[in-house]
Amino acid sequence: GRNYRFVPQMIIPKKPLQNSGFFNIFRYLWLNPARSGNDGSARPGKSALFLIPTVMKPARLFGMLLAGVFAAFTFSPASALELTGTRRIWDQAPHSAFTGLIDYEGKLYCCFREAKSHVPQLTGEDGKIRILVSDTGEAWEPFALVESQGTDLRDPQLSRTPDGRLMLLMGGSRYENGQFLGGISHVSFLNSRSRTFSAPIPIEVDKTLFPNKIWLWKITWHGPEGYATIYENDRLSLVKTSDGLHYDLVTRLRCDSMPNETALLFGPNDELYLLVRREIGGATGVWGESRPPYTEWEWNDLGIRLGGPNLCALPDGSILIGSREVQKEPHCGLYGLDGSKRAELLLRLPSGGDCSYPGFVVRGNTLWISYYSSHEGHAAIYLATVRLDR
């Protein structure tokens, strides 16, 4: 086999690249834009890592780089994370939980479920989706309350569609005196003129392929299409959509031990990564990797249990995992991935009891994290800020 080495800093003469048209391509490919050196060279930012053969002719080097043979993400723990603040931003319901966070048109939007309890115990105790808005992350105001008569709404997520709309995805379940009767995910869209969300609409799938509960989890948009997983009983499926409402099957995922909650993340070369919670066996989470058309997958055991998992790509090229930390006492924790794709705890957020389901937004060198916790009483919504070292 060929030996490879990581080159964290690589200086390339700028003038030949500009003359040949390569320079603009490299500016697009590098994680950080190239910057000019005093000697007329182009140097990638300090976080850019290239995987190149130890012995290679320049022509082959350019060809391989342009073909995308470099590290899409750095599978090593993130740079030091410093917790700079945490505050409770909502506690007006007996139970507020399951958060999502997005930066949309310069404002921060935080969504979550509010209800009387984690699961409806009596008829009429169905959950609603509350959305807060903030310009700076300091002061938060109520923006919307989305509800559906006779349906318990939960597990909300906000995303921006390819045509620029703000979309709310949420699960919708029917209960009678605490007994689950069935469920299907719903979507709602923000009207740009009225600044109100539409009534929740059930998603549409082929019922012959998904005859049971249709639970869509965390859509991630990539180009003109959105990808998500549907979990039902002990089966996990990858689906895609072009409008957020109609979903087609991509593949059945060969992931055992009752997989369910799944976060998705795309790499710069169309790689797709899955972070999957599992419920039986060892019940440890797994990490999946694939390339188009996303029908063949490689899986790695993370070595930890997951609860309400989410993913975030950091500016230094590392991947951050947010999940419930299941030790003697539960907490909401932030994890990195090492070279063997095992999770490593980096930071524990102020939390405890019924907690987790974080949302992530990166602004500059600050990571904003929404999550819920019951360490100060009933389950409430919190916002943490973490400084990212570059």
Task: State what each model feature region is.
Residues I11-F22:
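Positively charged N-terminal leader segments that act as targeting/secretion signals
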Residues A80-A97, I102-D152, R160-G353, V361-R390:
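Beta-rich carbohydrate-recognition and catalytic domains
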Residues M56-R60:
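Positively charged n-region of N-terminal signal peptides that target proteins for export
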Residues G63-T74:
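Bacterial N-terminal signal peptides
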Residues T74, A78-A80:
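Boundary at the C-terminal end of the N-terminal hydrophobic targeting segment
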